[in-house]
């Protein structure tokens, strides 16, 4: 059951409520109480930032409380969602240095819906944690229509918020993962990107100004810890260089990760992430997950990759070579920020490794005249320009040399030199048999400094 809070002191709140009644049939169950399938609405006179223990006002037990509200700012038309809490003194409701229970899974869903329903002129963003209330009685969030009186009375904007909130029926407040964010601007571009691009829900966010209000992280460890516990999170993104904050987070038993780590673990079970990082290397050191990682549930083989063949394939088509690895492997080790395969990989089974080698051979086929596999060996041959042969025929470096290298016949010293006269056979021959590598434990920062989620 979703509990929706409406405030008569907020014109945008009542306008969203009016739009919600247009798209959903509500039964009046009290003077200021209404119910529809999976939804209960309570209308309050006071401003919602000052309403404590709102969950107790509903007749039914609610799984979460959603406050529909205005957003004020110089941000133009904006639909947003955020959690509530104070990192310093409570100036606008709630308690000092306290955060309310968050609902990251539902928040991710509502931001996705806002993006789907937003009129063209509206932006969509997550805001950082701010203002009250901090005592709600259930996981909660504000979903807002902004940012000026014109938008507060805009039917299209209000209807978009109403539809997004209605879509929360049946959506649990929490999932199996969440990340909290420290640092950045009030409108949290990093968190908004993560919500748009990955399956990671975002919990509480402490913006730069919030951390200024917080003061020394080690002196307010309880607030830092509460961000995680209230979000059901064990991972954190830290914007910028904040050594004391990072140390405090790790001392509390949580794990600081990079945005790359969050993006690369999108859709991959965290137990699988931990196992593969332990068997191969860390994401920050080049581990990249393949398509099977999202659904594979069995064991896996750690295999040494055939470097000589990969070097040749990368020279033909780097992207296709990497795609071959990520299509068949649970995870691959890479260099150059994930743009080249190197080292080893984890495959679900021997058949997956063989399919990978077949795909790499197909990459070579694009530029090699012959590619064959026999007895665990791959052989690829092609005719290539031989600069030494051209020099031996007296062709100096320059435009004519370049045309000859490009496969064009040239006239030199009164004779025609055909490309075939300056070619040699290049052969790539390498062992591509499956060589399983003993698994070695890879130390991760979380081994001594944090815990997995």
From Swiss-Prot:
Its cofactor is Zn(2+). One of its GO terms (molecular function) is D-aminoacyl-tRNA deacylase activity. Monomer. It holds the Pfam family tRNA_deacylase. D-aminoacyl-tRNA deacylase with broad substrate specificity. By recycling D-aminoacyl-tRNA to D-amino acids and free tRNA molecules, this enzyme counteracts the toxicity associated with the formation of D-aminoacyl-tRNA entities in vivo. Binds 2 Zn(2+) ions per subunit. This is D-aminoacyl-tRNA deacylase. Residues 428-453 are annotated as: Disordered. It comes from Halobacterium salinarum (strain ATCC 700922 / JCM 11081 / NRC-1). The keyword Metal-binding applies. Signal peptide: none annotated. The keyword Zinc applies. It comes from the Archaea. InterPro entries: Deacylase_DtdA_archaea, DtdA. It catalyses: a D-aminoacyl-tRNA + H2O = a tRNA + a D-alpha-amino acid + H(+); glycyl-tRNA(Ala) + H2O = tRNA(Ala) + glycine + H(+). Keywords: Hydrolase, Metal-binding, Zinc. Belongs to the DtdA deacylase family. GO terms for biological process: D-amino acid catabolic process.
